[in-house]
Amino acid sequence: LRRGLLDQLSQGRIDLDRHERGAAFSLQQQQAFGLLSTGTLSDALDYTAEPAAVREAYGMTLFGQSCLAARRLIEAGGRFVTVFWDAYGLNAGSWDTHHNHYGRLKEFLLPVFDHAFSTLILDLEQRGLLDETLVLVLSEHGRTPQIDSKPAGAGRHHWSRAYSQVYAGGGLARGTVIGRTDRHAGDVEATPISPKDILATAFHLLGFDPDTTVPDPEGRPLPLTGTGRVRPELLG
């Protein structure tokens, strides 16, 4: 799998090197083109170049090493980096805990995430990168307040009425918990913040006007953030 990924990256780099229209790109496109068509990308993704102590600090898991690669990409000039949770290990290792919810959290999900994420934030801080890096830990929904007692046992299912997310760096407030649910964690009781609000706030922190519109396929103006608004509660 890793060799195949490396081969794909190498072939993509060769294809980009042959691209004759690179000079006509905008500044942003040229920056992206340059990152992909030089050794910078492959060097940044080579997390094995890090000292063993650093790799172990992130955790010797796919997610941990992916967070380390993300930090290296940021250092190399990457402007947008996504780290997906790896789905392997105990019960496929995903957060989609329709069964064995608590066992999966305790034995795999929480230890691996806490290990890698806390190290990433500390590493970014120590390298002077956290203030200029917006870190968002996002999911499309939460889990049901009720625990399923069917034969599969102890599962929690999809729930979008209330769920939490974690943010760090990039001009955000630190050490703050915003909002409150009822005692069952089923509904928001105070300070609801929508996904569109998060998008608007992120654009604001990145220097974009959240009210910007882009043309849809028919040429009509489409708001980037819909009805989202910048939330001052999130700002540092």
Language-model regions, residue ranges each:
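Ligand-binding pockets and gating/stacking loops
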Residues: L1-G236
